[in-house]
Design a protein with these regions (language model features):
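Thiamine diphosphate
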Residues: 1-152, 274-293, 297-301, 363-525
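Long, well-ordered, tryptophan-enriched scaffold segments
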Residues: 3, 188-404
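Conserved alpha/beta enzyme-core scaffolds, especially Rossmann-like or related mixed alpha/beta domains
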Residues: 33-37, 46-49, 153-157, 184-188, ...
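Short beta-strand segments
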Residues: 73, 99, 156-157, 183-187, ...
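Short glycine-/polar-rich loops that comprise or flank the Walker A/P-loop
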Residues: 151, 178-182, 214, 501-502
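A short alpha/beta connector and helix-capping loop motif
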Residues: 164-189, 520-523
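Conserved strand-to-helix beginnings and helix N-cap segments that scaffold or border functional pockets
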Residues: 164-168, 196-199, 516-517
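Anion (oxyanion) recognition and catalysis
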Residues: 175-176, 210, 310, 496, ...
């Protein structure tokens, strides 16, 4: 009997190597072949792209459906474009335009890239948070306008992005709690721009996520290593790997097989030496570098496990190799490194391509071509419209016999809008714990505060009716200007990401506006 699952993942293995080739070659062409008048390095991130090839292959070519939305790690833009090209969503002519005017952008852009980008990324930390607030927006839309087809909101996160404070502000906010359709996949390659990160902060980060109510999966080992752990001596092997410093383990990736044996077994217990005594250098090197973030089946299983968590967000820490599959793998200075022309030639031969067919898609009748075409159909989305067929009043009937502040006028206008039956359903307000002091109180009295579930009001206030339930139209945030602008951006994009146009209005005091502008820019860029 043919194992269809094994056959499918074998095909995906083949596809991911073509994805890696195209991503690396796009960057190589931009730097070495495209006319360059001033001779300045164009740049690109071949190593950072390589580390996410497996997880993006498993996502786009196996796991996602057409309603899902994904934020792609900024430096992985070439991988995204390679996958879109193989699925037929990007014309071949664009592959040689990376980082050129009018061409493929350095980082995914909703407005400037020709292929279907869901979230603009680039300013680290904002990409992961955007899908989180998009999911909060979908929850609001479903409560007010009826359930849409189920959608998952996913972010590919660079591990260094977890140094950004806005990440932790976003996951801790009450407005983002209980979102079971959110999954973050952390590219846990343990390297930053400048260095191999000393130590591993996974325990600290895991604690933060779990404290915020998230489901956490640590995908550290691939199938081969997990199988080895079950063999005699496997416990000693696992303990040795777990106890090894991050710096020592990272140093294995760029070594020849014989050097891997020597470095890995340095000061190792006798039981570990015995475990590898009957294994040649190539087998050993292949085994000890078998990380979960490059095991397509393990990734697919982890994604399914996250889907089963219906009442809380999930994060997968996928251990990867920065520069996976490339000569620069694991090099502490590989962040902006580029393969040499000779290495590109070697890579081309390794993936069985020539200069004549190096940019080709798979043949339509091949197993790989069939998968790519099928996935294009699965992921296809019809266009949506931002148009709202309503008439916005040009003025409201506010009269005053004495001067009033602009803030008071704003509050009175909002109350009048709440009386407009055609306009009111689409208006949603939000504020970072300053709703009443910015004169949203009158509006809130009329429309209520949004909560996924009805909440009992324990203390009656004769002036302010803080009534919380699924039909409320004000979303209250904690004191975080970054969260305010992230949410406003996703509410504004709800016409595309949730199929429902909204009219979002946010309030904050002017000294704090600048703190959130970066998030606002990336919502409209």
């Amino acid at each position: 009997m043919i194992d269809e699952s094994a056959e499918e993942f074998s095909t995906l293995e083949s596809i991911q190597h073509r994805v890696l080739w195209l991503a690396v070659r796009m960057i190589d062409h931009a730097n070495n072949e495209r006319p360059n008048v001033d001779g300045v390095k164009v740049g690109g991130h071949q190593a950072s792209s390589a580390s996410v090839v497996s997880m993006m292959t498993a996502l786009f070519l196996h796991h996602l459906n057409g309603h899902d939305r994904v934020a792609v790690k900024p430096h992985a833009a070439p991988v995204f474009h390679a996958i879109q090209y193989l699925m037929g969503n990007l014309d071949r002519s664009y592959l040689t335009t990376l980082r050129s005017k009018g061409g493929l952008q350095s980082y995914p852009s909703r407005t400037k890239d020709p292929d279907p980008v869901d979230f603009s990324t680039g300013s680290v930390g904002l990409g992961p948070a955007a899908p989180l607030f998009a999911a909060a927006t979908r929850r609001y839309v479903d409560a007010h306008f009826g359930d849409r087809p189920p959608a998952r909101y996913i972010a590919m996160v660079g591990d260094a992005e977890l140094d950004e404070g806005n990440i932790w502000e976003a996951i801790a906010d009450p407005a983002t709690q209980g979102l079971g359709n959110v999954m973050w996949v952390v590219d846990f390659n343990r390297q930053s721009l400048d260095r191999v990160v000393p130590g591993v902060r996974l325990e600290q980060w895991t604690g933060h996520f779990e404290s915020a109510g998230w489901h956490v999966i640590e995908l550290k080992y691939g199938k081969k290593l997990r199988g080895a752990f079950a063999m005699p001596g496997g416990d000693a092997l696992r303990s040795w790997i777990d106890e090894m410093s991050n710096e020592q383990y990272q140093s294995l990736f760029g070594l020849a097989p014989a050097e891997v044996r020597q470095r890995f077994l340095e000061n190792a217990p006798e039981a570990v030496h015995q475990f590898f005594s009957d294994m040649d250098d190539h087998q050993m090197a292949d085994l000890v570098k078998d990380l979960g973030g490059h095991d397509l089946e393990s990734l697919a299983d982890a994604f399914v496990a996250c889907d089963k968590e219906g009442d809380r967000p999930s994060v997968v820490f996928a251990y990867t190799i920065k520069g996976w599959g490339l000569p620069m793998a694991g090099n502490p200075r590989n962040h902006s490194a580029l393969l040499t022309p000779e290495q590109i030639d070697d890579f081309r031969r390794a993936v069985n391509l020539t200069q004549e067919d190096e940019w080709d898609r798979f043949d339509a009748g091949s197993a790989e071509g069939i998968v790519c075409n099928e996935r294009r159909e699965v992921l296809h989305r019809p266009p949506t419209s931002a148009h709202l067929d309503i008439e916005v009043p040009s003025q409201v009937g506010i009269r005053s016999t004495k001067p009033m502040s602009t803030q008071e006028a704003f509050g009175r206008i909002m109350v009048e809008l709440a009386r407009d039956d055609s306009l009111r359903p689409y208006v949603v307000t939000t504020a970072p714990d300053v709703a009443t002091s910015t004169n949203l109180g009158g509006f809130i009295n009329k429309v209520g505060v949004f909560s996924p579930v009805e909440k009992r009001l324990w203390s009656e206030d004769p002036v302010m009716k803080w009534s919380e339930g699924p039909q409320g139209q004000h979303i209250e945030l904690g004191i975080s200007e970054m969260n305010l602008f992230l949410l406003l951006g996703q509410l504004g994009l709800s016409w595309d990401l949730s199929g429902q146009p909204l009219i979002p209005i946010g309030t904050v005091y002017d000294p704090f506006v600048l703190r959130g502008l970066d998030a606002f820019i990336y919502s409209v860029y």
